[in-house]
Amino acid sequence: MKFIDLTIPFGIATPPWPTYEPLQVKYMKRLAPNGANGQIVSHSNHVGTHLDGEIHFYTPGKDIASLDFDFLAGDAAIVDLSDCCGDFDIYTPDMIEERVEVHEGDILIIHTGYHHFGWDQPYGNEVRYMVMHPGPDARFAHWCEEKKIKWIGVDCGSADHPMNTKIRDWMPAQAADCDAYFQETYGKSLPEIFTKDMYQMMHLWMFPKGIIHAECVGGDIDLLVNRRVQVGCFPWRFVDGESSIARIVAMVDEYEYQELMARKADLPKTKFGDCYDPVHVERLGGRGRTY
């Protein structure tokens, strides 16, 4: 068995979810005079590729240490929505099932393509990555429950639509752009589409049902879109942890791994060595406006 990394690089420049504490690192020992290098780190749980746990939003829920490996790893569907969703768009269960076969009890990884705007990417645009990515409607949340999805992964800042979170209040210019886009595209205003009772539904509705999610997935995800594969998420064994930084990988056999690595060799790379498919970037209009 071989692993394909679906985790973004983690460093002091990795942006946390807005208003959360970023990674900070300092040396507390050096080879001279201490004979060893040692570091102290501090950060929130919501920076880099991470798994949101139930108690992040649901007080009686499980902590991260309570999640067993049968839950964290297993059969998965990875779907690419970059051909149908752009800035502020809404995705539905139909869009997913038109592109990949999803079984009951699956892990579901959603490739919006917005990982291409992450801090580690040549087309980095933090505002698009955190504030303008696509997100789901209420039908999607109900469908996940019906499908008994184990957990969801997204390649952007949140499993919720950004304008169905506090970002709507923090970024009024983008909220106004989204409202205008919704009225033009869907015939309804932002408050009409994401009503008060739907607020952060992928967190507030889903976590009490045990359906949690990983955010900021990335790495070599472009190699594995619109297909089924084994996926594992490996957070800390974090007692009382509301969420956790995690390593997420896909698992393939040796023969397929060689095929995937041959394809990776033909694709452009980020400065950290992850590949990216220019087709996805072109669909989304390149870097887009910088703020």
Task: State where each predicted segment sits.
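Active-/binding-site microenvironments in catalytic and ligand-binding cores
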Residues: 1-291
